[in-house]
Every structure is written in C-alpha cells, then in structure tokens.
From Swiss-Prot:
SUPFAM superfamilies reported in the protein's UniProt record: PLP-dependent transferases
Cited InterPro entries: Aminotrans_V_dom, Aminotrans_V_PyrdxlP_BS, Pser_aminoTfrase, PyrdxlP-dep_Trfase, PyrdxlP-dep_Trfase_major, PyrdxlP-dep_Trfase_small
Assembly and binders: Homodimer.
The protein's name: Phosphoserine aminotransferase
GN (gene name): serC
Pathway: Amino-acid biosynthesis; L-serine biosynthesis; L-serine from 3-phospho-D-glycerate: step 2/3; Cofactor biosynthesis; pyridoxine 5'-phosphate biosynthesis; pyridoxine 5'-phosphate from D-erythrose 4-phosphate: step 3/5
N6-(pyridoxal phosphate)lysine PTM sites in chain numbering: K199
Main function: Catalyzes the reversible conversion of 3-phosphohydroxypyruvate to phosphoserine and of 3-hydroxy-2-oxo-4-phosphonooxybutanoate to phosphohydroxythreonine.
Superkingdom per UniProt: Bacteria
UniProt record similarity statement: Belongs to the class-V pyridoxal-phosphate-dependent aminotransferase family. SerC subfamily.
Cofactor: pyridoxal 5'-phosphate
Residues bound to pyridoxal 5'-phosphate: G76, R77, W102, T156, D175, Q198, N240, T241
Gene Ontology CC terms, in alphabetical order: cytoplasm
Length: 363
C-alpha cells in the first residue's frame, strides 16, 4: 500500500511507530493478557505508566519542580472555562489577547461565566500590505490588576503563530494545543499552560495542564470537582476515571519524541518542513499565503490557489496521490496543511512535489 500522508488539523496523525506499537499490544498490554483499555486506572501497572509519562514530559519540556502536570478530561475548549472557573473567583479580572478564531472563542466562553466587565480583550492582529501579522501590546503600560493574561500561541484556522515571548506583569495562561513540544519554551515564564491532546500529543478527549503552585492559591468559582485543578492535583488526575487509552497513547508519543532527540531536535525538523512548504508557495504564482512571514505558522500552513475554481480538483487529485485532509477550515476556505510533530519530512516533500506538478499542469 502506498504511503498516506494525513494533513488533518485535528484529530491529527500520530507517529507511525506509536500506532504500530499500539496495534501490536492492543489486546495484550505489558504481558497482562488484556488491553490497557481494560485494566483499572488505579492498578499498579497503570500507575507506573502514568508516572513514567509525567517523568518523560517533564524532561522533554524541562518543567520546574514547582509546577504540577495534570492529565484532564476534555480538549482545549474545556480549558477555556476551566481557567475562568479556577482563577476568577471573588470578582477577579483577566485580559485576553485575540489573534484568531481560537483565542476569540476563549473570550466568548469566559464572558459566559463571569461579567463582561471582568474580561478585557485586545485584538493583536493587523493587516498591513495585505498580510496579517501580530502586534503585541505593551502590557506593562496597562494599569490593571489582572489575575492572568491569556493568549493562544498558534491559530490553527488562520495559520498565525506567535513566536515572541510575552512580557507580562501578570501570570501568563497559554493555549499551546497546537504547538506544545514543537519547539522549546521556558515553562517558568508561564502561570499555566494547557494543550488539547489531538494535535501533538495523542487522541482527542485528553488535555495536558501544566500549572504553577501559586496559581492554585487564586480564588475560584463554584465548579465541578472533575474540572477543579486543585482536586486534580490532590488526586493525581484521578478524582474520577480518566481517559486511560488516551493517556497511554500520550505516554507512547512522549517516549517516541524523546527517542527522536527531544524537543530541540523536533524543532529543527519542524523548521525544515515549514520552510520547504512556504518556499513552494512563495516561489509559485499559482499559490498565495496571506500571513506575514514572521507570523506564519509552522504547524498549520494555510494557502489558497489563485484560481479558486480549481480547489475541488486540487483536493481530489491530492487525495488520489495519498495526500489527505488538505481542505481549509470552513471559515476561511482555501487549503491547510497541518504538519505537526508526527508529520515526516517526506510527507511535506510529497505535498510540495504534488503542488508543483499541479501548478505546471494548470498554468
């Protein structure tokens, strides 16, 4: 069977080696004669798995000792409300930086849970000479006592990524759902990091939350115990039955990434993949991209055909060539190639070859 390269934005492709290992041990995990899906989450075997998963993740991201690592239910949208409920009790206020669809959705969710007067937002994307780019505000010049400032590192729909580090007088809460472990970051600069699993970690239904000790002292709102960060810390992310198979696959992805040389090695490959694809777009008048080069996403490469009447044919022929899930988000249209950690360089090269050939045939 010819190779299939899956460019889906999420749930996204998993490393082939991880999928093959999961297939091999699906019905007999760890010599137990049963699947990892069938054992108690409180068994010594599963506890050993979860302990190792956290150890590996801490090493991969150099997570300081004063941070807790939580494996929680739900995706990024669940954390939109969890952050508010956990940190904005006693009339607390927060600032949201809006760079695209997902950060905007976080604002909308926050305003459902507290008064609109408690949530401030700043649009940080502007269009200059037809290209969208991020302009970070001077947060130190804002005279407000926010509990946190929230931003999304990468807008998967819009193809916009923020590479600059925020200089904030308040704790930073970051949605890293699509960039976690794609390049190195200094975790100590954040109050809380969250990431839905279905892009760079594993299957959907699981979120990783990395939270600093002092954040847990902030006043909270009444909420479900299942989504309370303090309860999750106290119970080792097992207040109730967690999504065990997703946790297992996440642990295997962490091990795979460590074996590949860690986050720094993965960052080099990700840079190569993105450069290869953007070079193809920029060098060919058949395609266009509307994001300024310094804010182009390395994870979600959005592009359009100059002649959009050819979109359907492009997608159909790409699928025939084993290049699937390239259709852009329904809000923005066009094409989107999601090239997370699991996408090999060979997959991006295959896409570039197809794009060049398609352009020649239809020019």
């Amino acid at each position: 069977m010819s190779a299939i390269y899956n460019f889906c934005a999420g749930p996204a492709m998993l490393p082939q080696a991880v999928m093959q290992k999961a297939q091999q041990e699906l019905v007999d995990w760890n010599g137990l004669g049963v699947s990892v899906m069938e054992i108690s989450h409180r068994s010594k075997e599963f506890i050993a798995l979860t302990d190792q998963a956290e150890v590996t993740l801490r090493k991969l991201m150099s997570i300081p000792a004063n941070y807790h690592v939580l494996f929680m239910h739900g995706g990024g949208r669940a954390q939109f409300s969890n952050v508010v409920n956990n940190f904005l009790g006693d009339n607390g206020q927060a600032l949201y930086l809006v760079s695209g669809q997902w950060s905007s959705a976080a604002v909308t969710e926050a305003k459902k849970l507290v008064s609109e007067h408690n949530i401030d937002s700043i649009n940080i994307v502007e269009q200059i000479n037809g290209l969208y780019q991020v302009k970070l505000p001077d947060l130190t010049a804002i005279d407000k006592d926010y509990r946190y400032v929230h931003y999304c590192s990468n807008e998967t729909v819009d193809g916009i990524e923020i590479f600059e580090e925020l200089d904030s007088p308040w704790p930073i809460v970051a949605d890293l759902s699509s960039t976690i472990m794609s390049h190195e970051i200094d975790v100590s600069k954040y109050g809380l990091i969250y990431a839905g699993a279905q892009k760079n970690i594993g299957p959907s239904g699981l979120s990783i939350v990395i939270v600093r000790d002092d954040m847990l002292k902030l006043p909270s709102l009444p909420q479900s115990s299942v989504m309370d960060y303090r309860v999750a810390v106290e119970h080792g992310s097992m207040f109730n039955t967690p999504p065990t198979f997703a946790w297992y696959l996440a642990s295997e992805v962490f091990a795979w990434l460590a074996a590949k040389g860690g986050v720094s090695a993965m960052a080099e490959v990700n840079q190569q993949k993105a450069a290869l694809l953007y070079d193809c777009i920029d060098s060919n008048p058949f395609y266009k991209n509307g994001v300024a080069p310094h804010n182009r996403s390395r994870m979600n490469v959005t592009f359009q055909l100059v002649n959009d009447a050819l979109d359907s044919e492009f997608l159909a022929q790409a699928e025939q060539a084993g290049l699937v899930a390239l259709k852009g988000h329904r809000i923005v249209g066009g094409m989107r190639a999601s090239i997370y950690n699991a996408m090999p360089l060979a997959g991006v090269q295959a896409l570039v070859d197809f794009m060049n050939n398609f352009a020649v045939k239809h020019s």
